[in-house]
Amino acid sequence: MKNIDEQIKIIKKGAEEIIDAKELKEKLIKAEKENTQLVVKLGLDPSAPDIHLGHAVVLRKLKQLQDLGHKIVIIIGDFTGMIGDPTGKSKTRKQLSSQQVMKNAETYEKQIFKILDRNKTDLRFNSQWLEKLNFKEVIELASKYTVARMLEREDFKKRFKNQQSIGIHEFFYPLMQAYDSMAIKADIEFGGTDQRFNLLMGRTLQAEYGEEKQIAIFMPLLEGIDGKEKMSKSLGNYIGIEESAKDMYVKVMQIPDSLIIKYFELCTDMHPDAIDIIRKQLNEDKVNPRDIKMKLAKEIVCLYHNEAEALNAEIYFKNLFQDKEIPEDIPIFKVRSENNLIEAIVKINSNTSKSEARRLIAQGGVKLNGRKVIDFNDIILKSNDVIQIGKKKIVKLLVE
């Protein structure tokens, strides 16, 4: 196991906030002295089973701690998932059935172990302890927190102010998530910055029950390839961890230069010192950002595929955008038969308006099957048509 200072450097890499950094060092010193592992927790709500790089930010951090010799515990919220995490929601979420939750959990499990070592990961379901609580114990748990404190939470506060309903069961979500920390005696819990309330609740509850408080480590939310909104499947700006090596490589190359370092920090296992060198090179204009981005794309593809596939993806990219070739196996994009070219462009580029799409065409920035589009009014889109928008965005259509 690495020395304490080196461990802290790795743990801090890319982290937005650590509560409390001093306590973290004390826990690491104690673990080293007693030759024990720290219990590192991540809770997952299995309501959205497909994992993209934004979700993987925390999983990659867990892998780093796993490699440092600590115990990783993944808690699948099969019990809490039937409520659904209300974080950031403007209304009560529809409850999932236990069958839906378990089906999603199976998909999660398959994807999690593309990142974590299955043999060194403790996978738990919180129904194992939450289902066993009797009503007396639930009342005792509820007594540890007040409604006033719950309403300090931003999403609840907004809904209360706007006279939108808040189910009492929704107040139990952060309490149950906090109880998970007690059940496994968590030393550290990871989450996104949007999970702040839930993670700090874990610290509060542990203290209420006389246990040692967990360290809460918050990872930043990752912007999608558009560089504007957080990565989201619904916004179409995501990179799925199960995408092909070629699609993954091409998508990484689409991120703005301003996000290169952030992606290195959050999406790769590159050592912080190596990232500092790249940061310095970029700041001093000693390298072409495009070359560094290609290095980033290769690093990411290697993590989810292998070096050979990453090399093939790089060749594919060079053929596509440097030698102006259009390979057959490009990403497929679904459009409806009634969509015209303008509507298709807006769908493909989620942040492009119809007027911007028309301007792109007028500027010669759109190609259909290798030819610049001049008059789009009479174009009828067909399956297997290839649309190229700008220099990097290229898709093959599937018309439904």
UniProtKB/Swiss-Prot annotation:
One of its GO terms (molecular function) is ATP binding. Keywords: Aminoacyl-tRNA synthetase, ATP-binding, Cytoplasm, Ligase, Nucleotide-binding, Protein biosynthesis, RNA-binding. A motif ('HIGH' region) lies at residues 46-55. Transmembrane segments: none annotated. Residues 339-399 form the S4 RNA-binding domain. ATP binds at residue 233. GO terms for biological process: tyrosyl-tRNA aminoacylation. It is an enzyme of class 6 (ligase). It holds the Pfam family tRNA-synt_1b. GO terms for cellular component: cytosol. It is found in: Cytoplasm. It catalyses: tRNA(Tyr) + L-tyrosine + ATP = L-tyrosyl-tRNA(Tyr) + AMP + diphosphate + H(+). A motif ('KMSKS' region) lies at residues 230-234. It comes from the Bacteria. Its EC number is 6.1.1.1. InterPro entries: aa-tRNA-synth_I_CS (IPR001412), aa-tRNA-synth_Ic (IPR002305), Rossmann-like_a/b/a_fold (IPR014729), S4_RNA-bd (IPR002942), S4_RNA-bd_sf (IPR036986), SYY-like_C (IPR054608), Tyr-tRNA-ligase (IPR002307), Tyr-tRNA-ligase_bac-type (IPR024088). Homodimer. Belongs to the class-I aminoacyl-tRNA synthetase family. TyrS type 2 subfamily. Catalyzes the attachment of tyrosine to tRNA(Tyr) in a two-step reaction: tyrosine is first activated by ATP to form Tyr-AMP and then transferred to the acceptor end of tRNA(Tyr). This is Tyrosine--tRNA ligase 2. It comes from Clostridium acetobutylicum (strain ATCC 824 / DSM 792 / JCM 1419 / IAM 19013 / LMG 5710 / NBRC 13948 / NRRL B-527 / VKM B-1787 / 2291 / W). The lineage of its organism: Bacteria, Bacillati, Bacillota, Clostridia, Eubacteriales. The gene is tyrS2.
